[in-house]
A protein has these predicted regions:
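RNA substrate-binding interface of SAM-dependent RNA methyltransferases
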Residues: 12-16
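Catalytic-core segment of enzymes that process non-peptidic bonds
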Residues: 17-27, 32-33
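Active-site-adjacent betaalpha module
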Residues: 6-11, 28-29, 33-165
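Short catalytic helix/loop segments, enriched in acidic residues and glycine
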Residues: 1-2
Length: 165
């Protein structure tokens, strides 16, 4: 991920973040229905605000000039956020997507992006899931239906360097 982020920033390509909501006590108090994935994340405190699980690694923190969309609550970085508006304001139609988790958030964001008319490329080695089976399902079965390309970080960096040369 760091190589792709560095190459995009060096090339002047706008970097966007679509982060998961960092949970706080009381977030689900008045919700009638909570998706199983949200219940699991809440019980594990996967994205708990102010905790280790709610922080980015320092090398992946947004930098000045990066754009951070509203946090999403379930899976898609587009659902109930301003990501689509932020991208359209910049005239962006092609997206390079990477991040976690391949079979949930990444896949849902890729699907939603395709539905909205974006050309989506996924960075194969800049994502992860909980198992090999989930990675296979995401990268070999589901995401190819929506992403224009699934490339390695090295291929992405090479393509960026060729396009700006």
């Amino acid at each position: 991920m760091s190589q792709v982020l560095e190459a995009t920033r060096d090339a002047g390509i706008q970097v966007f973040y679509a982060l998961h909501h960092r949970y706080r006590p009381g977030d689900y108090e008045n919700w009638k229905y909570i998706a199983p994935i949200q219940k699991a994340a809440w019980s594990r405190k996967t994205f708990e605000y102010g905790s280790w699980g709610g922080q980015l690694r320092s090398e992946f923190e947004p930098r000045p000039g990066d754009i951070v969309a509203q946090e999403h609550w379930c899976s898609s970085g587009f659902a109930n956020t301003d990501l689509d508006l932020l991208l359209k304001r910049q005239g962006i139609q092609q997206l390079i997507m990477m991040g976690l988790i391949a079979h949930t958030c990444l896949e849902a964001t890729v699907r939603f992006g395709a539905e909205l008319g974006y050309e989506v490329t996924v960075v194969r080695d800049a994502t992860a899931s909980y198992s090999d089976e989930e990675m296979h399902a995401a990268l070999e079965i589901n995401i190819p239906n929506y992403a224009t390309a699934i490339l390695s970080a090295e291929e992405i960096v090479d393509a960026i360097s060729k396009s700006t040369a």
